[in-house]
């Protein structure tokens, strides 16, 4: 079976490519390299012994997307990661997010609808829930008004897919991630932000390694036990394995609806300060940090109820927060050595 992975050299994408190849899939990767590098291919090869087929392609270029699918008519499924993904940046540059995250999806769906049957796994986000009215978050909670343009693009993306599946032969699984962290245990691939990191853990590890003087903690006045925001931090390898299970479900026609939705998290919320303490424990060092104002678009807390994924997919996150932080630290040390 051949699977296309868009954004397949990115953080989650590269780990998913590894798991797909480990399960025997033929993988084709496209990426525009805007937030990653070709060196990731070497890491994938080091882990799996195989380099996936790769094309540099910007999914905002409709003609190039059309040409790609003309040349790859034997693709059985698509896992669509390619997107801009930072809440804060999306507030500052919303049009970039609508262009990257909506146009690319539409162009892919336009090509998939030409096929007699097509399957897509969509990289969605817990941001679609906004500040949910109850915790933990279940899939049947109503989607709230988005707190950021990034979150809005994920809501719109889900709606576009749902509308499209009603009138085409496309089947879809929407995977709502919570907060992916960590790296492959081999430290051959990991999170590699170009420029200033947009996520907490790379900021922590870069501060720990000495690239940054101190970590900025955005807000300590949230209504949480220690005042800092709470998120559900899931090891990226656990997340990647869920994608393999999801694509197998579609390819084996085990899906029970044209569109299925699953939360992917650990089911446990951790505050920013708890993540810092986990890093300090695994690294053996004290992390310098300062409290600064909240970021626009950030919510108080979000953690998953994963019963549906556990029961229907037979998937459950395995790694602890400390294990994820240890793998992230191992990766940071390797790339700076």
Where are each of the predicted segments found?
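N-terminal Rossmann/SDR dinucleotide-binding element
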Residues: 1-77, 196
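Rossmann-fold NAD(P)-dependent oxidoreductase module
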Residues: 15, 19, 111, 160, ...
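Acidic/polar helix N-cap motif
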Residues: 60-61, 93, 305, 320
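N-terminal Rossmann-like NAD(P) cofactor-binding module of classical short-chain dehydrogenase/reductase
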Residues: 76-79, 121
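Conserved NAD(P)H cofactor-binding loop of Rossmann-fold oxidoreductase domains
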Residues: 82-85, 124
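Catalytic helix-loop patch of NAD(P)-dependent Rossmann-fold dehydrogenases
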Residues: 92-95, 99-107, 119, 128-174, ...
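C-terminal substrate-binding subdomain of Rossmann-fold SDR/epimerase-dehydratase oxidoreductases
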Residues: 203, 209-337
């Amino acid at each position: 079976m051949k699977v296309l992975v868009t954004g397949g050299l990115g953080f989650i994408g590269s780990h998913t490519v590894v798991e797909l190849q480990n399960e025997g899939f033929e993988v084709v990767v496209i990426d525009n390299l805007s937030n990653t590098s070709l060196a990731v291919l070497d890491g994938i090869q080091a882990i799996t012994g195989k380099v996936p087929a790769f094309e540099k392609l910007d999914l905002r270029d409709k003609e190039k997307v059309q040409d790609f699918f003309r040349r790859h008519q034997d693709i059985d499924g698509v896992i669509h990661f390619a997107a801009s993904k930072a809440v804060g940046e999306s507030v500052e540059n919303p049009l970039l997010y609508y262009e990257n995250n909506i146009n690319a999806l539409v162009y892919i769906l336009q090509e998939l609808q030409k096929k007699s049957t097509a399957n897509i796994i969509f990289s969605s986000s817990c941001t679609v829930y906004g500040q949910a009215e109850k915790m933990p978050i279940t899939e049947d909670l109503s989607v709230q008004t988005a707190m950021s343009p990034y979150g809005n693009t994920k809501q719109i993306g889900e709606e576009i897919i749902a509308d499209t599946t009603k009138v085409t032969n496309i089947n879809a699984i929407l995977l709502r991630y919570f907060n992916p962290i960590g790296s492959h245990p081999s430290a051959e691939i990991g999170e590699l932000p170009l420029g200033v990191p947009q996520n907490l853990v790379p900021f922590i590890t870069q501060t720990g390694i000495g690239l940054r003087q101190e970590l900025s903690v955005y807000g300590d006045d949230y209504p949480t036990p220690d005042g800092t925001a709470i998120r559900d931090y899931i090891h990226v390898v656990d997340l990647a394995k869920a994608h393999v299970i999801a694509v197998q479900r579609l390819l084996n026609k085990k899906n029970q609806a044209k569109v299925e939705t699953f939360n992917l998290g650990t089911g446990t919320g951790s505050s920013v300060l708890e993540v810092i303490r986990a890093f300090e424990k695994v690294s053996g060092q004290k992390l310098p940090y300062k409290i600064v104002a909240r970021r626009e678009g950030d919510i108080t807390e979000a953690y998953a109820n994963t019963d549906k994924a556990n029961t229907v997919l037979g998937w459950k996150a395995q790694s602890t927060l400390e294990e994820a932080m240890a793998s992230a630290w191992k990766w940071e040390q390797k790339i700076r050595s």
